[in-house]
């Protein structure tokens, strides 16, 4: 939202605080999107939280920070995609900036970004398997435990793949229902 507000400022009318926050947001997005998630997780577990042994929580934090950068850009793109005339229309109706964003711009942006947000959530869901690398306990970690006891790799890994596939299929189905429901509101 900060980046969108900064990008939509009129020339000559600049808010210095918005400029500072925009710079911080740009650095955050650039650094996080420009480095592999595996490296980020290793930095979180081996450098930042060196003394902590709660690897699952470190993994969740790392995944959240990584996904946040992508979600921020998805939201920014969705807000920028809404025609500027919508903001002017809201203002001409007497709505202030916040009400115009809340009642006019954001509902349109949500419809535009829903597929991309769904894809980001699916990627995040599948990336949870990377937590195993730093010692976090999750689905792949459990499969590795089974493989260590049974010396069988194929069935535990296929089982994990099937569980992830079912979770993704359920989420995709729910997302499709939500998209259809939002499309119905367009027809009214």
Model-found features: residue ranges?
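Transmembrane alpha-helices and adjacent helix-loop boundaries
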Residues: 1-188
């Amino acid at each position: 939202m900060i980046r969108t507000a900064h990008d939509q400022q009129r020339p000559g009318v600049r808010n210095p605080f918005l400029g500072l926050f925009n710079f911080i947001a740009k650095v955050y997005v650039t650094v996080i999107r420009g480095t592999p998630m595996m490296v980020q997780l290793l930095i979180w577990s081996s450098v930042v939280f060196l003394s902590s042994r709660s690897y699952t929580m470190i993994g969740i934090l790392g995944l959240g920070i990584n996904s946040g950068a992508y979600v921020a850009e998805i939201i920014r793109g969705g807000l920028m995609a809404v025609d500027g005339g919508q903001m002017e229309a809201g203002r001409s109706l007497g709505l202030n900036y916040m009400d115009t964003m809340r009642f006019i711009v954001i509902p349109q942006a949500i419809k535009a970004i829903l597929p991309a947000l769904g894809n980001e959530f699916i990627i995040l869901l599948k990336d949870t398997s990377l937590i195993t690398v730093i010692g976090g306990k999750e689905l792949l970690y459990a499969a590795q435990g089974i493989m260590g006891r049974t010396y069988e790799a194929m069935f535990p890994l296929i089982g994990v793949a099937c569980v992830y596939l079912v979770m993704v299929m359920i989420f995709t189905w729910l997302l499709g229902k939500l998209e259809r429901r939002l499309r119905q509101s367009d027809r009214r």
